[in-house]
Amino acid sequence: MTAVEYSPEIAKVYAQLYPQDTVVVGDAVAYLEAHYAEFDFIWTSPPCPSHGQYRHNVGVIGKGFAPIMPDMTLYAQIVFLQHYAKGKWVVENVKPYYEPLVKPTFEMQRHLFWSNFEVAPRKFDKADIRHKNKISDFDGHEIVAASKIPNKRQALRNCVDAELGLHILTAAMA
């Protein structure tokens, strides 16, 4: 397993939690472009704040935040992997406030996924994250707690549930 993290603080916590994994500190997009052919399976989750319904509906419309342009890295990674990756891959992001520019392969929980393999639909017990109020209620809370992200609960709400991630990985390895 190889994780690419831009933040040295988050990478350090990740490495402590998962000592068997390789942790690379750097630009995930540049790493993907340079190393995609080395992996049997790729999971990428480009930054989502500029796409999310929450920022658009609550922030821009509800609170008057300035709109920001969507980060097109999401679609660049999808197109790149569609045309160059030989192994299995999945790109994950939150449901956007607009119609996706590339049709997702599947949708589960609060996420859209683009992939080159099928994943069977499934419901998960932990799907209702609205009832998680403390940071420690979330899987992965140690990593986000180490970050400089101001709204840690919101960041964790956007993470993929561990059971869902395992379901997708199992489908990729089938």
Protein language model regions, located:
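Conserved active-site and SAM-binding loop architecture
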Residues: 1-174
